[in-house]
From Swiss-Prot:
The lineage of its organism: Eukaryota, Fungi, Dikarya, Ascomycota, Saccharomycotina. The active site is at 121 (glycyl thioester intermediate). It is a peripheral membrane protein. It holds the Pfam family Autophagy_act_C. GO terms for molecular function: Atg12 transferase activity. This is Ubiquitin-like-conjugating enzyme ATG10. Gene3D superfamilies: 3.30.1460.50. Its EC number is 2.3.2.-. It comes from the Eukaryota. InterPro entries: Atg10 (IPR016524), Atg3/Atg10 (IPR007135). Belongs to the ATG10 family. E2-like enzyme required for the cytoplasm to vacuole transport (Cvt), autophagy and nucleophagy. Acts as an E2-like enzyme that catalyzes the conjugation of ATG12 to ATG5. ATG12 conjugation to ATG5 is required for proper localization of ATG8 to the preautophagosomal structure (PAS). Likely serves as an ATG5-recognition molecule. It is found in: Preautophagosomal structure membrane. It comes from Kluyveromyces lactis (strain ATCC 8585 / CBS 2359 / DSM 70799 / NBRC 1267 / NRRL Y-1140 / WM37). Forms homooligomers.
């Protein structure tokens, strides 16, 4: 477990690291009153963007990832459009490296937006409980879902 105070303290450093990630096209740290959110847009393929949010799960007291997939298109008149994609598990696994991670779809109770959520039940077992550098250990594992070479960037 990671306290909310430690999460908020460590997240700005993580935002700096993630901004160096070659797949990240946009990185924004949103400082809310109680907790902070890191928003990352990343190009996965030419016409596919992943909108990723790292936030704090107050129930489990660990960081959490939610994401959405956006497909981009150009029509005959070069007008661009984007649509939200909802894929089967097999299709999703062909785009991102879920490996042993489980993902579910659910809606945000406040905004009613639908997101994929990475299951965070085993977070402490995966990254340990020592608060120092907790988020660094966490992103080096959990962001590999989106880029298996990410841990090299963090060394």
């Amino acid at each position: 477990m990671l306290s909310l105070q430690q999460y908020n303290k460590q997240l700005p450093e993580i935002a700096k690291l993630v901004s160096r990630w070659d797949k990240a096209s946009r990185v924004q740290l949103i400082k809310e009153i109680s907790d902070h959110i890191l928003v990352v847009n990343m190009r996965q393929k030419q016409f596919l963007t992943i909108e990723l949010q790292i936030n704090y799960d107050k129930v489990y007291q660990v960081p959490s990832i939610r994401f959405r997939l956006w497909e981009h298109a150009l029509d005959d008149e070069d007008v661009s459009s984007s649509k939200l994609l909802f894929l089967s598990d097999v299709e999703l696994r062909s785009i991102i490296a879920l490996n042993s991670f489980s993902v579910s779809l659910s809606s945000d109770p406040t905004t009613k937006e639908v997101w994929y959520h990475v299951n965070n039940c085993d977070t402490d077992a995966n990254v340990g409980t020592e608060p120092e550098r907790y988020l660094l250990r966490w992103i080096s594992l959990y962001l590999q879902i989106f880029d298996p070479t990410l841990n090299i960037m963090l060394i």
